[in-house]
């Protein structure tokens, strides 16, 4: 894509504002009841659409949840502990003070046939990031969802890990996204709504900033965002995938590298998916969520290696 002028530097002050607000985290949340000790994060017990995606296998991604509004799938999210789910803040726009409208379905592979081993839990409250502006494409599009009660862990319901400070994602690192979103713009996932998955490469942030640059004003790619996907389009996240995970495997454990946030259209050429980086917001999550598990490189300090081969299948809102 030919652009006019140079894109702005990545940033926009999002993380600077965020750092000053960390100390203002709600003491009510910090004093919440101690959670039960969970199983090891990021390790499915059973191993074996997203646009251009493919069916996942049952229990392949046991931390993925369906956030439902009035009983209908609305967004995806990821389980962190027995009482906390993480997702995109924009999923609750205009409804932040109406948690009774929402519920969380865990352990479901097919939304049309969730099965007796799935669990459905109400939402107690939602904690959006304090600097999120509620504007489309804004930085800090991340929220924590407090469940009304503790869930029961099983092979179908397990937590995902957050990346520790040793994790870095160089361009062309292959990770995965998953969700129950539309398979094309305006085409919902057909019954029985089987969870879709897609392998996506990380895209250099400067390249992504150029792709989304409009020639004036602040560029939309901020320092707390990651881009991933295929420049040719055809495979991507789509409506209904918002809030779902960008997952990378490190030393046998799956880490939540990012949260599906935004993009232009679905699977359009030169419009890759944009994700909120968990590395950028790890400290905020740790201030609120007691018992969240972090994982990194076994030897410490190393970046993830980009696989020599890849491709796969995809998810967004």
From Swiss-Prot:
One annotated Gene Ontology cellular component of this protein: extracellular space
A Gene Ontology BP annotation from the UniProt entry: proteolysis
InterPro entries found in the cross-reference section: Peptidase_S1_PA (IPR009003), Peptidase_S1_PA_chymotrypsin (IPR043504), Peptidase_S1A (IPR001314), Trypsin_dom (IPR001254), TRYPSIN_HIS (IPR018114), TRYPSIN_SER (IPR033116)
Domain named Peptidase S1: residues: 50-290
CDD domains: Tryp_SPc
SUPFAM superfamilies registered for this protein in UniProt: Trypsin-like serine proteases (SSF50494)
Localization, UniProt: Secreted
Gene Ontology molecular function, alphabetical: peptidase activator activity; serine-type endopeptidase activity
Disulfide linkage: 75-91, 175-248, 208-227, 238-266
Cited Pfam families: Trypsin
Keyword Protease belongs to the record: yes
Signal peptide boundaries: 1-32
Keyword vocabulary terms for this entry: Disulfide bond, Glycoprotein, Hydrolase, Protease, Secreted, Serine protease, Signal
Listed EC numbers: 3.4.21.-
Glycosylated position list: 70
Gene3D superfamilies the UniProt entry points to: Trypsin-like serine proteases
Keyword Glycoprotein: yes
Tissue and organ distribution: Expressed abundantly in the epithelial cells of the airways, including trachea, esophagus and fetal lung. Scarce in adult lung. Expressed at low levels in placenta, pancreas, prostate and thyroid gland.
Residues annotated as catalytic: 90 (charge relay system), 141 (charge relay system), 242 (charge relay system)
Family label: Belongs to the peptidase S1 family.
Function: Preferentially cleaves the synthetic substrate H-D-Leu-Thr-Arg-pNA compared to tosyl-Gly-Pro-Arg-pNA.
UniProt name for this protein: Brain-specific serine protease 4
Encoding gene (name): PRSS22
